């Protein structure tokens, strides 16, 4: 797993925890921060996937040369 994907997973997990804590304590701010962290994690993960796809395509073209 790449460092970027690991960071994305950390953001998603910490976001889920924050969101749950916010819900349990009734703290809407913490709950919202958790949702933002989860979305940030999803975005990082998608970006890492795109980078991996581009890297794979680039390597395929290099092999053809």
Swiss-Prot record:
Pfam families: CsbD. Belongs to the UPF0337 (CsbD) family. Coiled coil: none annotated. This is UPF0337 protein SAG1136. Residues 1-12 have a biased composition (Basic and acidic residues). The lineage of its organism: Bacteria, Bacillati, Bacillota, Bacilli, Lactobacillales. SUPFAM superfamilies: Hypothetical protein YjbJ. It comes from Streptococcus agalactiae serotype V (strain ATCC BAA-611 / 2603 V/R). Residues 1-29 are annotated as: Disordered.
């Amino acid at each position: 797993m790449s460092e970027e994907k690991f960071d994305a997973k950390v953001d998603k997990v910490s976001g889920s925890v924050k969101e749950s804590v916010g819900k349990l304590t009734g703290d809407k701010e913490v709950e919202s921060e958790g949702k933002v962290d989860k979305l940030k994690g999803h975005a990082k993960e998608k970006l890492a996937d795109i980078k991996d796809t581009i890297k794979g395509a680039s390597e395929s073209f290099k092999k053809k040369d």
